[in-house]
Amino acid sequence: MADEEEDPTFEEENEEIGGGAEGGQGKRKRLFSKELRCMMYGFGDDQNPYTESVDILEDLVIEFITEMTHKAMSIGRQGRVQVEDIVFLIRKDPRKFARVKDLLTMNEELKRARKAFDEANYGS
């Protein structure tokens, strides 16, 4: 009889703690669903993946970004996260480090191309 009384209480506590895909955030607006669906399809998933899969992946992405941001804030200057802080955090993960280097290089190339295009169009 005591066990029967504990089970409903346990379930209620579990729901309050936030067990499940929401990760304690309750029902929140999904920010990256469209992009994640496209990425999942690009990596070989179905064109219309299960909503639950997209939601779980989004929770993982947001958790990763949040943790990285908190770590970057703790090692860098107060109140600012800089690119160097992120690079420092991922320096021991070769795949992430290489990808960030590639993205930073492409960003610089795009900046130079835009500058050259603007100079050609508007003449300096």
UniProtKB/Swiss-Prot annotation:
Span of the secretion signal?
A: none
Q: Name one Pfam family in it.
A: TFIID-18kDa
Gene3D superfamilies per UniProt: Histone, subunit A
Write out the GO biological process terms: DNA-templated transcription initiation; mRNA transcription by RNA polymerase II; positive regulation of transcription initiation by RNA polymerase II; RNA polymerase II preinitiation complex assembly; transcription by RNA polymerase II; transcription initiation at RNA polymerase II promoter
Q: Which UniProt keywords apply?
A: Disease variant, Intellectual disability, Nucleus, Transcription, Transcription regulation
Keyword Transcription assigned: yes
Q: What is the effect of changing residue 40 to K?
A: In MRT60; impairs interaction with TAF11
Record flagged with keyword Glycoprotein? no
Single annotated GO MF: TBP-class protein binding
Task: Tell me the compartments it is located in.
Answer: Nucleus
**Bias kind Acidic residues: ranges:** 1-16
Specify the Histone-fold domain's residue ranges. 31-74
Q: Where is this region: Disordered?
A: 1-28
The record comments on the domains as follows: The binding of TAF10 and TAF11 requires distinct domains of TAF13.
Give the multimer and partner information: Component of the TFIID basal transcription factor complex, composed of TATA-box-binding protein TBP, and a number of TBP-associated factors (TAFs), including TAF1, TAF2, TAF3, TAF4, TAF5, TAF6, TAF7, TAF8, TAF9, TAF10, TAF11, TAF12 and TAF13. Interacts with TBP, and more strongly with TAF10 and TAF11.
Q: What disorder is listed for this protein?
A: Intellectual developmental disorder, autosomal recessive 60: A disorder characterized by significantly below average general intellectual functioning associated with impairments in adaptive behavior and manifested during the developmental period. MRT60 patients display mild intellectual disability, delayed psychomotor development, learning difficulties, and poor overall growth with variable microcephaly.
Q: Which family does it belong to?
A: Belongs to the TAF13 family.
Q: What is this protein called?
A: Transcription initiation factor TFIID subunit 13
Per the UniProt record, the source organism is: Homo sapiens (Human)
